Amino acid sequence: MANLMNEFPDIEIKQDEPLMNYTYTKTGGPADWLAFPETIDQVKELVDYVREHEMGLTVLGNASNLIVGDGGIDDLTIILTRLNKIEVHDNKVTAQAGASYIATTEAARDSELTGLEFAAGIPGSIGGAVFMNAGAYGGETKNVVSEATVMLPDGTIKHLTNEELDFGYRHSSIQDNNGVVLDATFALEPGKYDEIKARMDDLNERREAKQPLDLPSCGSVFKRPEGYYAGKLIHDAGLQGYTSGGAQVSTKHAGFIVNIDHGTAADYVNVIHHVQKTVKEKFGVDLETEVRIIGRQD
């Protein structure tokens, strides 16, 4: 394989870079190559190169809702956090894929636009939020996104409407076409700064009171099974505090798995499988992961 640092001298690229330095869980082995594009043109150059050389491609944002295997990731991994511009025009906020959801909600608040308060504490990037239709406290990304710009694997760029994004529970059409989110536009409503801020502050206080924000985690691990709450099932199964290696079912919120002592991706996966098995045995309910598990599971 060619040396990508020589192929792309204008893009910061690292070889065999440990991904634990970038993930919220503080786990993950090395990426063969890790690139930090700063423009859409640079993203396209990388995507085109991967296609032409039949390489694998993994695209990450804030890496907040995923577990990267201890063996790392093959070929090229792109982190989009340097594509982080946020612009406000009238009642619309457009944010690049690498912008944080939190910063985007703050930009909306500062422009007295309401509709994004639910996302005030979601730690992910805009790209990840659109990719998985992130939501919290009764709100979902699908309710406020009017369109998104997506680069398809063949390098073409498309502007997809809300309908074309085909949002579902923790799902969008981008998961099906292997596209890369470049930006998203949110259609909001005029509001009052003080009211918007009060709502955001309230949700953040609730989040801090209930969630283990003081420890590394991948956020909410499981999707909500129909008719149930994953956290309650895990609590009722007596699994809070269950530990494998350095990963533990949070004693503060059963829906979270936290890294308490140099946990590995394998530790996280072991806890996930034990929770799934136990909940299935006790309640007959299948817990499906919301968190994405990617990379080499060595």
Curated annotation (Swiss-Prot):
Major localization listed first in the record, in broad terms: cytoplasm
Disulfide bridge partners, by residue number: none
Cellular component GO terms held in the UniProt record: cytosol
Entry keyword annotation includes Hydrolase: no
Keyword Transmembrane helix: no
Catalytic residues of the enzyme: R170, S220, E290
GO biological processes: cell division; cell wall organization; peptidoglycan biosynthetic process; regulation of cell shape
Subcellular location, record wording: Cytoplasm
Reaction(s) this enzyme catalyzes, per UniProt: UDP-N-acetyl-alpha-D-muramate + NADP(+) = UDP-N-acetyl-3-O-(1-carboxyvinyl)-alpha-D-glucosamine + NADPH + H(+)
EC number per UniProt: 1.3.1.98
Pfam families, per database record: FAD_binding_4, MurB_C
Molecular function terms, GO-annotated: FAD binding; UDP-N-acetylmuramate dehydrogenase activity
Domain FAD-binding PCMH-type: residue ranges: 26-191
Pathway: Cell wall biogenesis; peptidoglycan biosynthesis
Cofactor(s) demanded: FAD
InterPro entries associated with the record: FAD-bd_PCMH, FAD-bd_PCMH-like_sf, FAD-bd_PCMH_sub1, FAD-bd_PCMH_sub2, MurB, MurB_C, MurB_C_sf, Oxid_FAD_bind_N
Gene3D superfamilies: 3.30.465.10, UDP-N-acetylenolpyruvoylglucosamine reductase, C-terminal domain, Uridine Diphospho-n-acetylenolpyruvylglucosamine Reductase, domain 2
Keywords on record: Cell cycle, Cell division, Cell shape, Cell wall biogenesis/degradation, Cytoplasm, FAD, Flavoprotein, NADP, Oxidoreductase, Peptidoglycan synthesis
Function field: Cell wall formation.
PANTHER family (alphabetical): UDP-N-ACETYLENOLPYRUVOYLGLUCOSAMINE REDUCTASE (PTHR21071:SF4)
Family that this chain belongs to: Belongs to the MurB family.
Protein name (database record): UDP-N-acetylenolpyruvoylglucosamine reductase
Organism listed in the record: Limosilactobacillus reuteri (strain DSM 20016)
Encoding gene (name): murB
